[in-house]
């Protein structure tokens, strides 16, 4: 059985390491505590966090203890990494709510509890810091000249970097020191854009404690063209079903570029490498087999097997010839009726899915009506020709009632 280090390397997670041979030895022979930071600026994790969650899962399965650090304190300041502007400040209540949402989502990948994964919030120690003591004990170890060469600051210098954001590296470094002293945490993991901040923490612990600790960054999730993955027309691809439906989530992965399928199977699923190597041999239309497997596996990880199966069935019913739409109740609509669009409530009445307009409004208010598995958000939703795939669309009422609308 290969070590977790070999697994991470073989599947393509690792971007940079501070001490490759030592880290390899540690992960193979010892059980370590490591941490990954999460920025609580939204009430859901998104695809950008997916890869980090997979790394935590691989590490915990190998016997290592994860710490999920919620940046409640640093979120009140703002990480300049990858940003060209300053962001709004958050309240403690907002941060607490978001952290609770994160823990629920992370629990699908790692196990929390006694002797297992833990979640901490750096607001618990950062908000109580004495500024003079912090400058004297921590700030003294940082060279401004060296900090200014870090990638995370370079892009902001011309546009302007506030002093409050300039402190971010010091605070993240202090987090590592705090977790080292309190939990024996000896490794920080993060996206490759966090490399400078990770090195800052390693250097601080070496200077303050005289101890060697380690850092590892992983590949950022990008397409073969170098663009960030997880962006849709509606914005980020969220892991919360209320923000991105399981069907939309499934379809995103089902429709990714051929060149990205194998990479995503390695990084975002637990499909064994031997199987992935077989998928890599597929050509042309056969690649769709690998895409379906990818879409199913990632949706199962985030939303559970039942939702993944539902999304798969809906996609097949909508887009694959000879699929089960033939057996659905069907209403035929003349294309002329759609020249200016047809109101969703009028269409529901036409299909006899509702007895009255009032019932239609009630269902829409409760989120109970979907068109092609995308929830209808307002009473004024117009159904147009653009909603039809191969001359048909599917309306879903509640969880189990499907109805086909067919163009004639």
UniProtKB/Swiss-Prot annotation:
It catalyses: tRNA(Tyr) + L-tyrosine + ATP = L-tyrosyl-tRNA(Tyr) + AMP + diphosphate + H(+). Homodimer. Keywords: Aminoacyl-tRNA synthetase, ATP-binding, Cytoplasm, Ligase, Nucleotide-binding, Protein biosynthesis, RNA-binding. Gene3D superfamilies: HUPs, RNA-binding S4 domain, Tyrosyl-Transfer RNA Synthetase. GO terms for molecular function: ATP binding; RNA binding; tyrosine-tRNA ligase activity. Disulfide bonds: none annotated. InterPro entries: aa-tRNA-synth_I_CS, aa-tRNA-synth_Ic, Rossmann-like_a/b/a_fold, S4_RNA-bd_sf, SYY-like_C, Tyr-tRNA-ligase, Tyr-tRNA-ligase_bac-type, Tyr-tRNA-ligase_bac_1. Catalyzes the attachment of tyrosine to tRNA(Tyr) in a two-step reaction: tyrosine is first activated by ATP to form Tyr-AMP and then transferred to the acceptor end of tRNA(Tyr). GO terms for biological process: tyrosyl-tRNA aminoacylation. The keyword Ligase applies. The keyword Cell membrane does not apply. A motif ('HIGH' region) lies at residues 40-49. This is Tyrosine--tRNA ligase. Belongs to the class-I aminoacyl-tRNA synthetase family. TyrS type 1 subfamily. ATP binds at residue 231. It is found in: Cytoplasm. GO terms for cellular component: cytosol. Its EC number is 6.1.1.1. A motif ('KMSKS' region) lies at residues 228-232. It comes from the Bacteria.
């Amino acid at each position: 059985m290969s070590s977790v280090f070999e697994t991470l390397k073989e599947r393509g997670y690792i971007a940079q390491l501070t001490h490759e041979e030592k880290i390899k030895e540690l992960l193979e022979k010892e059980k370590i505590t490591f941490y990954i930071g999460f920025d609580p600026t939204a009430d859901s994790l998104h695809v950008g966090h997916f890869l980090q969650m997979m790394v935590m899962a691989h590490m915990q399965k190998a016997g290592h203890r994860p710490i999920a650090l919620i940046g409640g304190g640093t979120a009140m300041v703002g990480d300049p990494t990858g940003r060209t502007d300053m962001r709004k400040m958050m309240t403690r209540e907002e941060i607490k709510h978001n952290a609770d949402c994160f823990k629920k989502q992370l629990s699908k990948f790692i196990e929390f509890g006694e002797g297992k994964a833990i979640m901490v919030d750096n607001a618990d120690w950062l908000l109580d810091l004495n500024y003079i003591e912090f400058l004297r004990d921590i700030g003294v170890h940082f060279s401004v000249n060296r900090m200014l060469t870090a990638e995370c600051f370079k892009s902001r210098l011309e546009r302007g970097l506030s002093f409050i954001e300039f402190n971010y590296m010091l605070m993240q470094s202090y987090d590592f020191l705090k977790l080292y002293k309190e939990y024996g945490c000896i490794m920080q993991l993060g996206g490759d854009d966090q490399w400078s901040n990770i090195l800052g923490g390693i250097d601080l612990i070496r200077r303050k404690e005289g101890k060697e600790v380690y850092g590892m960054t992983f590949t950022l999730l990008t397409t073969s063209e170098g663009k960030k993955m997880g962006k849709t027309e509606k914005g980020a691809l969220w892991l919360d079903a209320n923000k991105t439906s399981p069907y939309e989530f499934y379809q995103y992965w089902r429709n990714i570029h051929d060149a990205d399928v194998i990479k995503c199977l390695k990084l975002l699923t637990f499909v064994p490498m031997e199987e992935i190597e077989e998928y890599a041999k597929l050509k042309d239309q056969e690649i769709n087999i690998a895409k379906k497997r990818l879409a199913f596996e990632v949706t199962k990880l985030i939303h559970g097997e039942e939702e993944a199966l539902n999304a798969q069935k809906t996609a097949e019913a909508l887009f694959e010839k000879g699929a089960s739409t033939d057996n659905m109740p069907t209403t035929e609509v003349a294309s002329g009726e759609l020249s200016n669009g047809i109101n969703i409530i009028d269409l529901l009445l036409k299909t006899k899915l509702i007895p009255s307009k009032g019932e239609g409004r009630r269902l829409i208010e409760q989120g109970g009506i979907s068109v092609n598995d995308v929830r209808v958000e307002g009473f004024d939703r117009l159904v147009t020709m653009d909603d039809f795939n191969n001359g048909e669309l599917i309306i879903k009422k509640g969880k189990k009632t499907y109805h086909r609308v067919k163009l004639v």
